[in-house]
Amino acid sequence: MTIMRKSHPLFKIVNHAFIDLPTPPNISGWWNFGSLLGMCLIIQILTGLFLAMHYTSDTLTAFSSVTHICRDVNFGWLIRYMHANGASLFFICLYIHIGRGIYYGSYLYKETWNIGILLLFLTMATAFVGYVLPWGQMSFWGATVITNLLSAIPYIGQDLVEWIWGGFSVDKATLTRFFAFHFILPFIITALATVHLLFLHETGSNNPLGIPSDCDKIPFHPYYSTKDFLGAIMLIMLFMILVLYFPDKLGDPDNYTPAXPLNTPPHIKPEWYFLFAYAILRSIPNKLGGVVALILSILILALLPYLHTSNQRSMLFRPLSQFLFWTLVSDLLLLTWIGGQPVEPPFIIIGQTASILYFAIILILMPLAGLIENKMLKWK
């Protein structure tokens, strides 16, 4: 008799995805972040659902309703801080996941990679509209500044901005629709993540060596399910230290002041996970140019499969590419710091140099390094 998990129509899907899935025997801890992202998404959906039960998307009561959640709802403060810091955790895992994909050449699975980029865009959109909901000073001004960037689009820009606002400024209509978007987008992300997995399981996982491992694959359970469980426990421990001891460390103090359209904060800046893109946006003096650079800073990832010149997939044995990869990581950290600084010397020139370096590494230096490494290894 066939085991139920192998014959039942529903269990069979789960079995092929998480139990009997053939997995390379040598994937490292860097491969844990896919499952950790799934865990983060579940945490965000559950905490968000409980917050939505008490939140009101009205300009007059939004700020008060968040205060009410923290003060009067049972463990409301915990749910709120888990949700707020869960976003930071989500982006940490997301950026490491992308970094691993770049380092080990996982971007050569084009369908999986492109859906991943779409997931990144949707996650950024979800985080942005979510940041507006508490209706603090930074929420309001962040929404005003970022949505205003669309006015740089020729001809239709201004109409597009007013259409998104639902009026002539960020107001009640904007908050209501942003809440609606923030509620629905995570479910779209969940559906897309399933498609992401579907395409991944068509090709099978990559491995640190970047070579086919079909001949010696092992079942996902119990080997990697145990490994993922250990990763999840470690991440939850770090997460709870952040939530219980440093809940406001990654937030902005200005967001504890109710939104006032008549009072502008001294430095308008987004959450830390968007600062690198914000720095690239600010490094170009032209508004439209800045918006294009901002979009390209993420969209450039879609070009990676076509810019791959090396005869090796992984960077594991490519010292030149490794050096450029870690330079890129350092550059992104520098851009993140610059994004949080005021627009004045010397930050302007540092931001512009770091932005040029970011695009140069991906578009020019990495493909060049691949060709040089091929020559060094005497591969035709």
Swiss-Prot record:
Gene3D superfamilies: Cytochrome Bc1 Complex, Chain C. One of its GO terms (biological process) is mitochondrial electron transport, ubiquinol to cytochrome c. The chain crosses the membrane at residues 33-53, 77-98, 113-133, 178-198, 226-246, 288-308, 320-340, 347-367. Its cofactor is heme b. It is a multi-pass membrane protein. Heme 1 (or BL or b562) is low-potential and absorbs at about 562 nm, and heme 2 (or BH or b566) is high-potential and absorbs at about 566 nm. Belongs to the cytochrome b family. This is Cytochrome b. It comes from Thomomys bottae (Botta's pocket gopher). The gene is MT-CYB.
